[in-house]
Amino acid sequence: MRGILCLLYNPPVPTHPFDRYAAFTDLSVLKAASDRPLRKSVRVNTLKCSVADFKAWAQEQGWSLTPVPWWPEGFYVDRTDLSTALGRDLRHLLGHFYMQEAASMLPVALLDPAPGEAILDLCAAPGSKTTQIAARIGLRTKDLGLKDLKHAPLASDDACLGVVIANDMQEKRLRVLNDALQRTGATSVVITRKVGQWFSKHLTERFDRVVCDAPCTAQGTARKDPTALQYSSQDSIEKAARLQYQLLEAAIHAAKVGGRIVYSTCTLTPEENEGVVLQILNKFSDQLEVIHPKEALPSGLNWDTSAAISDSEIVQKSLNPNPNPNLHPFLRLWPQTYDTEGFFCAVLKKTKPTRAVEPLEMFPRAARLLSRKNAEAVSRLFTEQFGTDFLQDDECLVEKGNFILLAGEKAHAFPLPVTEYAMGIPFAKILPDGRYRITNELASLRGHLASSHVLELMEEQLHGLLAGKDIPVDSALRGDTILRHRGISLGVGLSKEGTLLNRLPRWVVKLGS
C-alpha cells in the first residue's frame, strides 16, 4: 500500500512547496491565505474559570470574542489595545485561559472525552491538547449532569475525575508540558517519557480514547512561522510519514475495543495525512471503522464539516487507483477554508482486538500515597489555617521528594509499567522541620475556597507584587497568606511583622519586568 500511494501521487518538482497542491485547491488563494497573519484565539480553562466569567471579563477589557465553531470554550480574540501581549496577560499567566490556535482545538473536540475515562495523549508536548482534555474530564458529573454528556464513559465505574496519560520523548518539551499542566491546575494527568511505539506492547487496550497529534512537516503553520516551509523536502515528508504510521498503529493497539482514536497533523501533505490513515485502514480493515466528524463532535455544535470533508475526498481520489474509490469523511482544513492553520484530522473506532494483550510488568511509583496519618495532619492544618482542606472527593495526596502532590485518584491508581515522569500539581511543600507550606499552584487553583488567611489586594499592592516587591500589610496578618484580587487567586505570600514577603511564581512576577 505504501508503494502504491507514492506512485499514484507523484507531482512534478515544485518551485514552491504548495505548487504540488494545484490539483487540489486554488494555489493563489492558498498562498494568499498563508501569507496573512494568523487570527489570535484562546481556550477558556474551565478548571479555573467559567466561560461566562471569561466572557464578562473580556468585555471589561474591550475584547471582541467570536466563538470557535468546533469547541465551546474556544474564542477568536480581537483587541484594540495591543500594548500588552496576549501571552503576558495576568489571567493567561494564571491559567484561566490558554493561547491555542483554533484548528488545534479540533482533535480533542473529535475525541470528545468524558469524565471518568482513561485517555492517552501519545505526542503530548507542549500541552495544548493535554490541558484541553484535562479540563473536559475534570468536569464532574455533578457539574455537567450525565444527561449533558453525548456519551457515557466506556469505563465501568461512574463518571468521576478521569486520567490522562500525557507522553512525549524530549526532555525540554516535557518541562514545557509540565509547566503548562501546573499552571492550568490539571490534577488528572500523569506524564510519561517513552517512544510512542512503546504503548503498542506495554499498554495494549488500556485507553478509552487516544489522540495521536503526530510530529509532522508542519506546513500548515506557515501563517505564524514562514520558516516552516523549509522542512518540506520529499525526504522529510516520507520520513515523517513512516513515523506517523508507526505512531498511529501504536495508538490503535493502545485503545480499548470500542475506543476512539483521533489522528491529526498540522501539515498539508497527502503522504502524512490521508496517505497514513488509508494505509492503516488497509492493514486493519476488519478492526477499524471511520467515524463521521458530525457523530464525533460534542453535542450542540452546528459546525458545517462538508467543505473540509470534500477537500479531503479530492486528495483521497488522487491516492486511489480505483475509478470509484471508497472515500472516507476525513477533515482537511486548508488555511483559506476556515481562516485557520492548515490541519488534518481523522476519527477511527476500534471494533476488534488488533494484538494480544500481554501481562503488565509493574514498576514502583515515584510518587507514593501519603500515609493516612500525614494526610489527616495536612488536612487539619489547612482547615485550621484557611478554612478548607482544598480537597475534592475523587482526589488524593501523594508524596514525592519534599513535596506533597494533589492528584486524581484514577491518575495515581492507573497501572503503569514505567516510573512516571510527573503527576498532578504541587499541593504543599514539606519544610526541613516537618511543617507543610501551601504552594502557589494550589492557591491559584483552589484559593477562592479559602475563608481565612486571605489578603484581598488593592491595585497598588498588586502592582508592587507583580514587580517582585514585598509589600506592607496589617501586622495582625501572620503566616502563609493567599493573595486574591477581584476574586482571582494569584498565589501565596508570607506575612511577617507587618510585611508580606512576595512568594508569587516566576511566571506571574515577570509581568512587572
Task: Map each language-model feature to its residues.
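Conserved class I S-adenosyl-L-methionine
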Residues: 116-123
